[in-house]
Each structure stands twice: as C-alpha cells, then as structure tokens.
C-alpha cells in the first residue's frame, strides 16, 4: 500500500512519537488540547475510545487534509481506572496498588481523514502482572523515571520492565500506541505503517 496522504499524530507523547519514528514513518505532530476527563458512566474501553476520538476531532479542526492518528491510554486494576497521577504521592500509591497484581493497559485509537471526515476506531487490551514492589524499589524507580505523565505511573520502555513479572498482549499498547491495531485502522484509509 502506498502512503499518499500525510500522517498527523494528535499527541505530544514522546513515546507515541518514538514508536512511529522507529517504523520510519513520516508524520507531523498536531497535539490535541482536550481535557482528558474520565466519564465514570462509561466502561474503560468506551472511555479510551471516546477520548481518542475527541483528540482526533480536535486535531481535525486545525487542519484540512491528512490522516489523523489519536490515542488515549489508561491502566485498569480490578475495574478501577488509573490515569496519570496527580503528584508523586499519588504515583507511589498507584504502584503500591499494582504491586503483585494483574492489571490491564487499555488504549483507544482513532483515525480520521481530515478531508472526508471518515472515522475508524479500535482498542487494545494488554494484561500485565507486576512483581512485588516495596517502597525502596518504587523510590528508586521514580529516580529514573518521571511517573507524572504516564497512565498507572510507569512506563514499560523506561525501566518499567523491571517492575513486570509477565505481559500478555501487545507490548506497543503498553507504551501507548498498539501498532497492530493502528495498522489495521490505517488500512481502511489505504495507508500502511510499513
């Protein structure tokens, strides 16, 4: 498949940018400015799909052509949505909650053709189990990584692997952009990541 349309990433996330760059994708960044508020009446998957759609629509309002990619990620533990921590104390509480437990990384992805307004959406779910995390390990981890811009207060690609006992599903989803789902969505627009 040939990529004749420009790709627009509606995210300021350095992790999503890095994932696309590693594939050799050429794209522009038009970050969305929407407030990422969870709707408690919606399921986790409905929330990430809704927020990724709002981000994509926000970017689409700023440009006239191109294929817009937007994503939103959360961590879910026993039905509780863990977004980005409010502060370091909140981040520490999140990792203590995740200690020795299985949780889900869920990312909603929306692709919009800015010209035709065609929309396609998907979501990915990855199961992750953490090792037992003591306070010293959490403090050492926070010296290596700023947890405040990360759902669940960790990043698998930034020394977060040392926290993880097992993972089942898309690794790139845990980073914040499930490349398999994204490539399927882009195919609906005649575009491929590779």
Q: What is the predicted role of each segment?
A:
Residues 2-25:
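N-terminal beta1-alpha1 ligand-phosphate binding loop
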Residues 2-7, 29, 41-194:
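Anionic-ligand binding patches
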Residues 12, 32, 114:
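Cofactor-binding loop segments of dinucleotide-utilizing enzymes, especially the Rossmann-like FAD-
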Residues 16, 36-38, 118:
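Flexible, glycine-rich phosphate/dinucleotide-binding loops
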Residues 18-22, 39, 61-62:
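Short loop/helix-cap segments at secondary-structure boundaries that form the rim of catalytic
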Residues 28-37:
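A short beta-strand-loop structural module common to alpha/beta enzyme folds
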């Amino acid at each position: 498949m040939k990529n004749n349309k420009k790709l627009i990433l509606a995210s300021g996330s350095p992790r999503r940018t890095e994932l696309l760059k590693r594939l050799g994708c050429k794209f522009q960044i038009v970050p969305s400015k929407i407030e990422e508020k969870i709707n408690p009446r919606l399921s986790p998957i409905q929330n990430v799909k809704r927020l990724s759609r709002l981000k994509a629509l926000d970017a689409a309002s700023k440009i006239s052509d191109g294929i817009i990619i937007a994503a939103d990620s959360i961590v879910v533990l026993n039905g509780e949505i863990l977004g980005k921590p409010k502060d370091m104390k909140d981040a520490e509480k999140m990792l203590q909650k995740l200690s020795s437990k299985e949780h889900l990384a869920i990312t909603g992805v929306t692709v919009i053709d800015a010209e035709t307004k065609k929309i396609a959406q998907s979501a990915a779910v990855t199961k992750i189990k953490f090792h037992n995390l003591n306070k010293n390990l959490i403090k050492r981890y926070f010296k290596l990584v700023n947890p405040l811009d990360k759902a669940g207060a960790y990043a698998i690609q930034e020394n977060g692997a040392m926290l993880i006992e097992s993972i089942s599903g898309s690794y790139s989803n845990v980073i914040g952009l499930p490349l398999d789902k994204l490539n399927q969505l882009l195919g609906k627009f005649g575009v491929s990541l590779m």
